[in-house]
Amino acid sequence: MALAIILPLRNQSELASLLKRLYDPTSPEYRHFLTVAQFTAQFGPTGQDYASVEKFARSKGFTVANTPDNRLLVHINGTAAQVNKAFHVTMTNYRHPTEKRTFYSPDREPSLELRVPVVHIAGMNNFSIPRAKYKRAPPNFRRNAIGSGPNGAYLGSDMRIAYYGGTALTGSGQSVGLLEFDGYNVSDVTASFAGQSNSVPIQNVLVDGATAGSDGDDGEQVLDIVQAASMAPGLSQIRV
């Protein structure tokens, strides 16, 4: 079983106050965000508490799989028997009330022989399983080709017309930041405008050794860029 022991944040009232100041334009701390190291030092579990949880897990026979820098999670792997013994539960299979399957879950709330506070232990049950929500169109399905793009496809400008109508709002003087987990090809962005011009500058901000290129699987990144530029054509820049 793959579990995650979740530890609580410290100084939560101070954190709530900091969040207000970070997003208050009148505050000297406006948008002065903390680094991971700064956040961990001020609000994360202490190194001593985190080490205690790691020691506890290993003493119960678990393998510690991952230790994030913010010290909020201790990822562990172990058997059901180890889970039963460590957390004073009995892992049991139950019939799902609404689905034709069984699911596993402990017979009671877990408890730990540990002085360090723990918020939650994730992975103790599979009652809910993530599933794709897409639906396959029937073979005789026909779509209305009413967009302004090739073969009636929708362009970003069509989305602006549909949602904004004749409004004068263009996003003038503002910037949009897009967090993407892969690169993109500029040629794909250009092609997505289908001959329409894009006047919004696109600036790449590469972090942690990332590169701007793509192996071709850049549909999500390109869509995000095109939609932002089309919905707000007066933007001063898009930072990707």
Q: For each predicted feature, which ranges?
A:
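Substrate-binding/charge-relay-adjacent region of secreted/lumenal peptidase catalytic domains
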Residues: 1-69, 75-76, 80-240
